[in-house]
């Protein structure tokens, strides 16, 4: 059996982090999670930490802002996967510095898991978040650290349960608001699958110093196509309200945080088409479902079925 790298996840109790921790543990990689003392005693995150222990995950106490704790943790593993949240993206320079000092890390996955930030046409406030991720890429490359960037596009759990309708808790059954003309195609991936594909990439030479795009054929839909699929499932035609780009841009400017960030990402994806408006070239990227055709991913159609 091939050697399986030891993997450390930073931000493992966060939204996408927990899926990556679980995928790593279940795939037989020796799995480590960096946790702060405060996380263990947190009522919600503490439960997750207990779940990790049950999966055989080793907890390493440390903190993004404690350089020595990072170096000590990194010396025990081969691969570092960062899944830190929005507010800590810029602070990943601290991870890079500790990787340089530790000197043994075979691969670094910075916190990405969305659009390919080198190929976006975003407005503020999403523009700055994307630019911060791009800066972390450049810093990683400049330091000569081996890397993989996972561009997993949309989390299914963010979009599909409500079809991006604000204030709803299930998909709409009367009317639906559609951004732009509804024709730009986007990609929707279930979080478990993002975890699975990410871990598969860890020891794969084909993904070294590349962007891994998670774009399975059955998960690429325009907004109009998703609405049509949902209408077919519920046997009903919805009233469609199209929001022109100018109106969406105005809404972004007038909305509070985090609504403005979400709307700006929706603008990038559904108006500018930033998930699908470029070709993946072998010089910079590979596509996960082509690399790992044996992974049985959840399709958009299967995902929506639970809400019918």
Swiss-Prot record:
Catalysed reactions listed for this entry: (-)-dehydrodiconiferyl alcohol + NADPH + H(+) = (S)-isodihydrodehydrodiconiferyl alcohol + NADP(+); (+)-dehydrodiconiferyl alcohol + NADPH + H(+) = (R)-isodihydrodehydrodiconiferyl alcohol + NADP(+)
Alphabetized GO MF terms: oxidoreductase activity
Name of a matching Pfam family: NmrA
Record-listed E.C. numbers: 1.23.1.-
Keywords noted in UniProt: Allergen, NADP, Oxidoreductase
Positions bound to NADP(+): 11-17, 36, 45, 137
Disulfide bridges in this chain: none
CDD domains tied to this protein: PCBER_SDR_a (cd05259)
Record: active site: 133
Chain coiled-coil ranges: none
InterPro entries linked: NAD(P)-bd_dom_sf (IPR036291), NmrA-like (IPR008030), NmrA-type/Isoflavone_red_sf (IPR050608), PCBER-like (IPR045312)
Domain of life: Eukaryota
Enzyme class: oxidoreductase
Gene Ontology biological process terms in this record: lignan biosynthetic process
PANTHER family for this protein: PHENYLCOUMARAN BENZYLIC ETHER REDUCTASE 1, PINORESINOL REDUCTASE-RELATED
Role summary: Oxidoreductase involved in lignan biosynthesis. Catalyzes the NADPH-dependent reduction of phenylcoumaran benzylic ethers. Converts dehydrodiconiferyl alcohol (DDC) to isodihydrodehydrodiconiferyl alcohol (IDDDC).
Assigned protein family: Belongs to the NmrA-type oxidoreductase family. Isoflavone reductase subfamily.
Protein name: Phenylcoumaran benzylic ether reductase Betv6
Originating organism: Betula pendula
Gene coding for it: BETV6
């Amino acid at each position: 059996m091939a050697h399986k790298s030891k993997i450390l996840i930073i931000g493992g109790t966060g939204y996408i982090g927990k899926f990556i921790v679980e995928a790593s543990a279940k795939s037989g990689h020796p799995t480590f999670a960096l946790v702060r003392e405060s996380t263990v005693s947190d009522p919600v995150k503490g439960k997750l930490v207990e779940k990790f222990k049950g999966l055989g995950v080793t907890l390493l106490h440390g903190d993004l802002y404690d350089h020595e704790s990072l170096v000590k943790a990194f010396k025990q593993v081969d691969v570092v996967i960062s899944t830190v949240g929005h507010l800590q993206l810029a602070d990943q320079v601290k991870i890079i510095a500790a990787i340089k000092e530790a000197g043994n890390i075979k691969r670094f996955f910075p916190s990405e898991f969305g659009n390919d930030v080198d190929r976006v046409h975003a407005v503020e406030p999403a523009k700055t978040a994307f630019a911060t991720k791009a800066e972390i890429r450049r810093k990683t490359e400049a330091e000569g650290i081996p890397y993989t960037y996972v561009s997993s596009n949309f989390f299914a759990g963010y979009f599909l349960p409500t079809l991006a309708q604000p204030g709803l808790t299930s998909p709409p059954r009367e009317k639906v608001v559609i951004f732009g003309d509804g024709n730009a195609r986007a990609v929707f991936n279930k979080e478990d699958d993002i975890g699975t594909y990410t871990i598969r990439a860890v020891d794969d030479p084909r993904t070294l110093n590349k962007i891994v795009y998670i774009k399975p054929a059955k998960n690429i839909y325009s907004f109009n196509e998703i609405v049509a699929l949902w209408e077919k499932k519920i046997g009903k035609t919805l009233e469609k309200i199209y929001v022109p780009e100018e109106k969406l841009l105005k809404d972004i400017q007038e909305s509070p945080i985090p609504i403005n960030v979400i709307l700006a990402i929706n603008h990038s994806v559904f108006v500018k088409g930033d998930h699908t408006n470029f070709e993946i070239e072998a010089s910079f990227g590979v596509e996960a479902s082509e690399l790992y055709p044996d992974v049985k991913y959840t399709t958009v159609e299967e995902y929506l079925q639970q809400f019918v």
